[in-house]
Amino acid sequence: MSIEARLAELGVTLPAAPAPAANYVPFVVSGNLVHISGQISQNAAGLIKGKLGVDVTVEQGAEAAKCCAISLLAQLKAACGGDLTRVVRAVKLTGFVNSAPDFTDQPKVINGASDFLVAALGDAGRHARAAVSAGSLPLGVAVEIDAIFEIRV
């Protein structure tokens, strides 16, 4: 099944790729790898803000991470010239979780992105990963995730 068909089955429509918030590019294609800059937690309603262990639950954080993954796929689609059939696999995610000092469930939060990528890409969505605590994130968002994908050139 194609990525587009899986997304439709999941009820997900990719948004336009978000514009960078500062002096950087949203992605770099180097050889057969696409390095995607950090995507912050946002949806159609706006930024998903807050701190895990204070005012955001693990479940809400996982949903925020899923929103980051949707933005990652939007950037990936742009990097592939709109053709997601070029995607070979997800390679690596690095997830940053805006966390209270005693919060230790960062992996459960970033599972929201990992689970979504496996659902959207099948086995090609399985990836290496880091889930890291952050004392704060840009614009007060709950989650930020960057990624590396392999594509056909």
Predicted regions and their residues:
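Short, polar/acidic, helix-capping and beta-turn segments at strand->helix junctions
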Residues: 1-153
